[in-house]
C-alpha cells in the first residue's frame, strides 16, 4: 500500500498507471525549487531490499540489481512502469508478483480518538520488541529478519517499525513497517509506502491490522 500526501500537478499520470522515472522528472521540473531526487534508490529492510523502480532510468538497471539478491533474502522492485521489459532481461530468474497495491487518501480522518483503547500502537522501542516482530513474521511464513538489524534502525528517518501492544498483557500482537520516500530519495511526490503488516493470529482484539495501517499513515502525514 502506498501512502501519499496530495500533490497537485498538471502532468499527473492516470490513477491506474504506476509512477515512472519520467513522471518523477516531470513533477520535479514543476517544483522549480525542489532538490533532485536520488536515482537508483533502494533500502535494506533486513529481509531484503526494496528497490524504488521509478528512480531507475532504465528497466535493465532494475533487473541488474535484482539479479544480485543475496541468498536467504528477498529483493523486491516496486513502482515498475514496464515490468515486462525488466523480466525480459532475465526471464528464467525474475518473476512478476501478482499482488495488487492500493493508495490511501491522507486527507481523510485516519484515527478516531477512542480507537485502540485496549491496544496501543507505538514505534518499536526495544530489542525484545524486535524479536517479537520477527516471531510474527515467522508465524505468517514471511522472510525472517534479524532482530538486531530491526533494532539498529529504531532511530532511522527512512524506515520505521510500529508495534501494536496489548494494553493488559503488554505483548506485541501486531507490526507494520513503513518506508519514507522523502528521506530515502527526496521524492518530489512526497510519497511513502507500507510493508510487512502482520498481526498475531490468536489476538483477542479485532482490527489490529487496520489500527496499524491507520497509525502508520498518521506517522507519515506528520
Give the residues covered by each predicted segment.
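Short Lys/Arg-enriched alpha/beta "domain-start" segment
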Residues: 2-45, 61
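Short amphipathic alpha-helix that is part of the acyltransferase structural core
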Residues: 5-6, 109-147
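Acyl-donor-binding surface of acyltransferase catalytic domains
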Residues: 25-29, 47-118
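Conserved acetyl-CoA binding element of GNAT-fold acetyltransferases
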Residues: 40-57, 188-201
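Conserved acetyl-CoA-binding loop-helix of GNAT-fold acetyltransferases
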Residues: 58-67, 195-199, 205-221
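Short coil/turn motifs at secondary-structure junctions
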Residues: 107, 181-183, 202
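Nucleotide-sugar-dependent glycosyltransferase donor-binding/catalytic pocket residues
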Residues: 126, 204-205
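A conserved beta-strand-loop-helix scaffold within acyl/acetyltransferase catalytic domains
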Residues: 141-198
Amino acid at each position: 500500500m502506498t501512502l501519499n500526501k496530495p500533490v497537485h500537478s498538471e502532468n499527473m499520470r492516470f490513477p491506474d498507471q504506476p509512477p515512472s522515472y519520467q513522471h518523477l522528472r516531470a513533477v520535479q521540473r514543476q517544483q522549480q525549487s525542489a532538490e533532485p531526487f536520488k536515482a537508483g534508490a533502494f533500502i535494506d529492510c533486513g529481509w531484503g531490499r526494496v528497490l524504488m523502480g521509478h528512480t531507475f532510468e532504465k528497466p535493465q538497471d532494475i533487473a541488474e540489481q535484482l539479479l544480485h539478491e543475496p541468498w536467504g533474502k528477498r529483493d523486491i522492485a516496486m513502482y515498475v512502469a514496464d515490468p515486462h521489459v525488466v523480466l525480459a532481461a532475465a526471464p528464467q530468474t525474475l518473476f512478476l508478483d501478482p499482488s495488487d497495491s492500493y493508495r490511501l487518501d491522507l486527507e481523510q480522518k485516519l484515527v478516531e480518538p477512542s480507537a485502540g483503547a485496549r491496544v496501543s500502537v507505538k514505534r518499536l522501542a526495544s530489542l525484545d520488541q524486535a524479536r517479537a516482530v520477527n516471531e510474527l513474521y515467522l508465524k505468517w511464513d514471511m522472510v525472517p529478519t534479524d532482530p538486531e538489524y530491526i533494532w539498529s534502525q529504531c532511530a532511522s528517518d527512512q524506515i520505521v517499525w510500529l508495534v501494536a501492544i496489548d494494553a493488559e498483557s503488554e505483548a506485541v500482537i501486531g507490526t507494520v513497517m513503513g518506508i519514507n520516500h522523502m528521506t530515502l530519495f527526496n521524492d518530489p511526490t512526497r510519497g511513502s509506502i507500507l510493508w510487512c503488516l502482520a498481526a498475531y493470529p490468536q489476538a483477542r482484539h479485532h482490527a489490529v491490522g487496520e489500527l496499524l495501517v491507520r497509525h502508520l499513515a498518521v506517522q507519515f502525514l506528520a
